């Protein structure tokens, strides 16, 4: 997260070492404790005993986001985005995405226009681009922090930091391959197209 904010401030693309750092990000899926108050040391008394070891890193996370937000409203947008992702931000391992991309390529499926509707850190995009490097990619990632990092990893691709439900009608039928491991669960998403 720190690296992504640094790249934004400096207005540049990441070095290979910075790309390696960005790729290690794995989201906050299952870590509800990041939503607990962590501004002051006294906030720790309200934390569950099992989460206390994460108090200091959580305080650092919020400090980092606050320092890199233009204002309190932007900080709140980041926190709200984190709230929206703690139940769904579980990213597919590279071994699985590589295997799926290899099987598709083995069957002659080489996309010209690739859609990733829930990209996370872009594992499916990375795996498929090894077989179809010229593919035109559109990747959606709803979480603001993850989307920021994904944009740095794929500066030459179309990365949209918003929900897939925002895709415009002209893209219906546009893609020849959609590849994803969308979040599963009973969380409803509003989509006016299917109202």
Task: Go through the PLM ranges and name each one.
Residues 1-195:
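Class I S-adenosyl-L-methionine-dependent methyltransferase catalytic core
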